[in-house]
Structure formats: structure tokens, C-alpha cells
Amino acid sequence: MKIKILFFLALPFLAYASEHGGTNYDIVERTLNFLLFFAILVYFAAKPLKALYQSRIDRIANKLESIQEKLRESKAKKDDVLKRVEEAKQNANALIETAKKEAVNLAAKVKKEAQNDIANIEKGYKEQKEFEERKMTKGVVNEILSDIFSSDSLKVDQKELVNIILKKVS
């Protein structure tokens, strides 16, 4: 009995909830139209959109590859420059060592030549001194002898002649 009462009480609600015959919602047809439109759109626009997207991917990949190539080239150049700098440092050190050795050798050579020149000058001085002494001695002897031989009044014996020569020489 209670079910019958509930049925009669719910009947007006069910009557108002039913269709009045005025508005008909066509959700199924609209959904099918949308899906059909989307399928046609995908069919015609998918290939150009996919090609556009793929060309963009290719451009980015090419740009990335060119950047990586430039990076590799710059690294190779950097390594080459670093090698050259290291070689230049080694060459500079070798040149410095060679210059130091040459300076030492040149100083020794100049010193040796100076010593040889000094020895030659001293030798020349001694020879010149001896030559001048002999020349002076000859001159003195010639002068004494010419004095002795020019004056006939003076007769000198050998001892006196030696004494006179010794006095003139000293």
C-alpha cells in the first residue's frame, strides 16, 4: 500500500520530468557531426601540419648540427692555438738558453782575445824597449868612440875606455 501511495505522489514529478514535445535535444547528431568534421579536418590538414612540424624539427636539428660543428671547429682551433703557444714557449726557452750560452762563449772569447792582445802588446813593448836600449847603447858607443877617435891628443888605454863607456851607459 505504501508503494501505491508513493507511486501516486511521484507521478506528478514524473509527468513534469517527461518531454513536453517542444524541445528536442539532438546531442547524438551534433556529436556525430563534430566527429565527422574533426575526421575530415584531420584527414586534410594532418599531412601539411605534419610536414610543417617535420620541417621545423629538421631546421632545428640542422641548426643544432651546425652549432655543434662550429663548436668542434672552435675547440680544434683552441687546441691548435694552445699547441702553438706551448711550442712558442718551448722555442723561447730554447732561444734564451742558446743566447745565454752564446753570451758566455762570446765573453770567454773576448776575454781570451783581450789577454792575447795584452800579451802581444807587452811583448811588443819589451821588444821595442830592448831595441831602444840597443839603439841607445850603439849611439852612446858611437859617440864615445867618435869622441875618442876625433881627439888625437887624448890617448886612452883599454881600462879607461871601459870606465868611460860604463859611465855613459849608466
From Swiss-Prot:
Recorded family membership = Belongs to the ATPase B chain family.
Keyword Ion transport included in the entry's annotation: yes
Task: State the taxonomy lineage.
Answer: Bacteria, Pseudomonadati, Campylobacterota, Epsilonproteobacteria, Campylobacterales
In the UniProt record, which is one GO cellular component term?
Answer: proton-transporting ATP synthase complex
Listed name of the protein: ATP synthase subunit b
Keywords from UniProt, A to Z, are: ATP synthesis, Cell inner membrane, Cell membrane, CF(0), Hydrogen ion transport, Ion transport, Membrane, Transmembrane, Transmembrane helix, Transport
The record's listing under NCBIfam families reads: PRK08475.1 (NF006292)
Q: What does this protein do?
A: F(1)F(0) ATP synthase produces ATP from ADP in the presence of a proton or sodium gradient. F-type ATPases consist of two structural domains, F(1) containing the extramembraneous catalytic core and F(0) containing the membrane proton channel, linked together by a central stalk and a peripheral stalk. During catalysis, ATP synthesis in the catalytic domain of F(1) is coupled via a rotary mechanism of the central stalk subunits to proton translocation. Component of the F(0) channel, it forms part of the peripheral stalk, linking F(1) to F(0).
The question of whether Transmembrane is a record keyword is answered with yes
Q: How does it sit in the membrane?
A: Single-pass membrane protein
Which is one GO molecular function term here?
proton-transporting ATP synthase activity, rotational mechanism
Q: How does it assemble?
A: F-type ATPases have 2 components, F(1) - the catalytic core - and F(0) - the membrane proton channel. F(1) has five subunits: alpha(3), beta(3), gamma(1), delta(1), epsilon(1). F(0) has three main subunits: a(1), b(2) and c(10-14). The alpha and beta chains form an alternating ring which encloses part of the gamma chain. F(1) is attached to F(0) by a central stalk formed by the gamma and epsilon chains, while a peripheral stalk is formed by the delta and b chains.
- Gene name for this UniProt entry: atpF
